[in-house]
Amino acid sequence: MKSRIECIPLEDAVRLGSEMGIGAVQAGKNAFRTLACHPDLVRHVYGLLTMLATRNKLASRLRELIIMRIGWTTGSEYEWFQHYEIATTRAGVSPEEILAVRDWRKSELFGPAERAVLAAVDD
């Protein structure tokens, strides 16, 4: 699939990421490389995303379930693909739970807190 907006070259993204304190792996991702077409924008957006990801009161497991549900309901293959690994390796979400996010109301894998956040996503 061809991007609708071209990404900046990987080397440029890594250099900009380094200036911002972002590692090469993160700076090499398409989302960063696309936003980096506008360096001022990427600085602000990544500042906001970092704050949301690191200074919130939501457990990482719940956050990733929310992201996976949003990815599923919006048909975002990119979001689903990017966060599958994060959810399974860093947030303690099993592959079975990720698949169950698609039709979570019928699943017995989720407790009350998880069901509440998944319902909030659907609302």
PLM region spans:
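Mobile cap/lid helix-loop segments that border enzyme active or cofactor-binding sites
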Residues: 1-60, 89, 112, 116
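Short, intrinsically disordered/low-complexity patches at protein termini
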Residues: 9-10, 67, 86-87, 120-123
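Short alpha-helical scaffolding segments that buttress acidic/His motifs in well-ordered protein cores
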Residues: 35, 45, 49-52, 65-71, ...
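Short helix-to-loop capping/linker segments positioned immediately adjacent to catalytic or ligand/cofactor-binding
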Residues: 52-56, 73-74, 107-108
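Conserved alpha-helical segments that form or flank metal/cofactor-binding pockets of metalloenzymes
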Residues: 58, 62-65, 70-98
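Residues forming well-ordered secondary-structure scaffolds
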Residues: 82, 96, 112, 116-119
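Acidic/His metal-coordination segments adjacent to aromatic residues that form catalytic metal sites
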Residues: 101-112
